[in-house]
């Protein structure tokens, strides 16, 4: 997500997501199912979404390319249409990953509730990339345009796959292979 606030009620500028298998390594070529929409901020305002001055100022310090993508006027759709499309995209996913446990998912869940749509995941299916990147394994994330919702989603998915791959090929103190998340697949 790219937003105009950091609260769960934040106005959404763009939504980006990718489908990926954390146990795979096929996402490195950017060959994955993608979701990307630019949201009409007026539609967010109509349902009571928030904007913060500090976030607007923060955007002023980001790259021109990121600002152009986040604030460009072309191809914007209503938040209701964006959430309906995201619902379909996420339906049936075994896990939902976000970059921070308390940001993207809480904002999206607020919108799903606000527009009267079911949340397409359960609380136990939510995963956090920041936590996995913090365990001390280099995620080898490729360079992308920072603060572009789709580019960031792809970058984070590659990082998750790289960390999982490293864990799967690591050995324990007695020489056995680590079997992360064996019953979670």
Positions of predicted regions on the chain:
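Conserved non-catalytic scaffold segment of RNase H-like nuclease domains
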Residues: 1-98
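Substrate-recognition/cap helix-loop segment adjacent to the acidic, metal-dependent catalytic center
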Residues: 87-90, 102-123
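Short, flexible loop segments at boundaries between secondary-structure elements
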Residues: 120-140
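Short, function-defining helix-loop hinge/capping sites that tune catalysis or transport
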Residues: 8-10, 136, 160
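Gly/Ser/Thr-rich active-site cleft segment
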Residues: 109, 115, 127-132, 150
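Generic detector of well-ordered alpha-helical packing
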Residues: 1-3, 105, 129, 153
